[in-house]
Amino acid sequence: MRADFFLSDNRAALLKRGLTIILSFLVFTSIFLLPSPSLAEDVKGADDPIVVAGNIKVKPDKKEEFIALSQTFIEPSRSEPGCISYSFYEDETEDNSFLFFEVWRNRAALDYHFQTPYFHEFVEKSPDLLAKPAEIKIYKIAETQTL
């Protein structure tokens, strides 16, 4: 009878520990991985456009996998409140090279994008597909003029 008592205590402790881990994960995810409501409000702030230009060289045998991964986050990114433009191109002049060209309303909009789950998924999965580190530059538009 004593062994059964310890088993039930161990099960209860394991269950409690498991629930603690799950709840901790959910709290962490909601705080750090999901865009915060206050950040979403900042996106509506003043226009101060930010341009992101990325050049990505992919391993030849990973090209199709990279395209599929990229396509999973293009539409959600375009739907974000601060996204002005989001383009993904295959470079016609260099094999296995891709270009991203993004325009965001302001830095808060880009920061919001960086916190989305699909962006985190891309950052997590893409390194194994790349032939070399991605070349990504962020530009702040100082002035625009009509031609």
Swiss-Prot record:
Gene3D superfamilies: 3.30.70.100. This is Uncharacterized protein sll1783. PANTHER family: ABM DOMAIN-CONTAINING PROTEIN, QUINOL MONOOXYGENASE YGIN-RELATED. Residues 50-138 form the ABM domain. Pfam families: ABM. GO terms for molecular function: catalytic activity. Belongs to the LsrG family.
